[in-house]
Amino acid sequence: MNLIQQLEKEQFDKLSANKTIPEFGPGDTVIVNVKVVEGERTRVQAYEGVCIGRSGGGINESFTVRKISYGEGVERVFPILSPMIDSIKVVRRGKVRRAKLYYLRQLRGKSARIVEKQDRQQAAAVNE
């Protein structure tokens, strides 16, 4: 392991020590609680949408969340280890076959829906 990788690993371990980052990927609906500074006050704002992709790795990893706000599509890119992110919560898991869901930008209404992924144990428990 070279010096740069070693330094990045140390920084990643230090930054992620006090954060819990859930496992999520493209197609998952997530709620990202973002710290917003207004003057001298700081408040937490929830940003809920579909993760349309993750990029980078280690300390440089980021993810893009897309939501529809008042009929207009809004995308926001969040660095995973950003100090402005208070928490990340996975609401539902989506069943997709792509790593980047950029095709959702052209879709409207029902065609833009993502099918929810079913857990095998959960489905077996429901059928019994």
UniProtKB/Swiss-Prot annotation:
Belongs to the bacterial ribosomal protein bL19 family. This protein is located at the 30S-50S ribosomal subunit interface and may play a role in the structure and function of the aminoacyl-tRNA binding site. It holds the Pfam family Ribosomal_L19. This is Large ribosomal subunit protein bL19. It comes from the Bacteria. GO terms for molecular function: structural constituent of ribosome. GO terms for biological process: translation. Keywords: Ribonucleoprotein, Ribosomal protein. One of its GO terms (cellular component) is cytosolic large ribosomal subunit.
